[in-house]
């Protein structure tokens, strides 16, 4: 297997292999389509329609109608395609340092966004056509050093790798950046928008704290503790009603957090009449990343101390232009120009409501030799969690919505077939909104 993903409403599961791709219904589990395209390394569906996006070679994407067996269009890019995201309005293609945004109705190119290097394709496009938001790591502008480069040297990227976990919220309908959310002190490892495009879940490379923000205003609503020790987050997934958030990592435990309790977030700074057109930034830093100041408990968090406000904060109209370069420069100008008041939060992040322990042996006879990669989703019709693992297992667990606790394995299938291999190339296990 090369790739596996759920569609936007989790009703289908797509698997890419060296021999082609397969599409399954998740409830009840059954194979509904097989494609014979060779070496499919990315496949993404548009809900339960016959439209799929397929990557077979590094720089090439094919949009295909599986029902008619026809190719709708083919796209070639200047560098390797790392991920594809789509909804009923927009089609996004992620390269390492660019995002190409298309109108899915006619596949016309609408916008090109320059980004910091994003080798893990951290990006989420909401499934909603109304709240059509694209979230990705905030580009970090390269600082001018004054050093002269040789004339024959290739031009440097205007951005460098992020050193903190800030998320840029981009309106894919109006083609404007609308907010920056300071989610974590450490760089991001995974983000996910909910089905309605109103919530954003984030995790940093530390992997111990999961946060949920409102979109597009960026207010922090929930903070959850996944664990005490650092972990690599593989998948974040809201259920369809946005009352639960499921998290998988490089441990054998999958955590389910409940949303809908007391809303906890940062109070908003007082706004002047002109502040409505400025970037609003929600600051929420990982307490486990670095030593907390005196008087702050290990489980608490503290926002940065406010700095002197820059004179050149600007407005959305003056900062945001059609050019993606101007988006980056505008963001950079406002980052240093608008800081909220200092706030110290003394509340402990909430623990999981329920959890799942994956089988130690997986789908094989012998126990796994290392951590299993997984992608998770939640059923839209029952309190069940669906998990696909890197050894080809498809597991369905029942969750007690009253008491929580450990989920019960109720069904188990395999998405492997006799000619599939679990050997390299490495498998990309991503949820649709990651």
UniProtKB/Swiss-Prot annotation:
Swiss-Prot/TrEMBL keywords: Autophagy, Endosome, Membrane, Protein transport, Repeat, Transport, Vacuole, WD repeat
InterPro entries for this protein: PROPPIN (IPR048720), WD40/YVTN_repeat-like_dom_sf (IPR015943), WD40_repeat_dom_sf (IPR036322), WD40_rpt (IPR001680)
GO cellular component terms given for this protein: endosome membrane; phagophore assembly site membrane; vacuolar membrane
Residue ranges, compositional bias (Basic and acidic residues): 274-286
Ranges spanned by the short sequence motif L/FRRG motif, renumbered to the chain: 224-228
Membrane topology term: Peripheral membrane protein
Annotated localization: Preautophagosomal structure membrane; Vacuole membrane; Endosome membrane
Function of the molecule: The PI(3,5)P2 regulatory complex regulates both the synthesis and turnover of phosphatidylinositol 3,5-bisphosphate (PtdIns(3,5)P2). Necessary for proper vacuole morphology. Plays an important role in osmotically-induced vacuole fragmentation. Required for cytoplasm to vacuole transport (Cvt) vesicle formation, pexophagy and starvation-induced autophagy. Involved in correct atg9 trafficking to the pre-autophagosomal structure. Might also be involved in premeiotic DNA replication.
Family statement: Belongs to the WD repeat PROPPIN family.
Name of the protein described by the UniProt record: Autophagy-related protein 18
Organism: Botryotinia fuckeliana (strain B05.10) (Noble rot fungus)
Lineage of origin: Eukaryota, Fungi, Dikarya, Ascomycota, Pezizomycotina
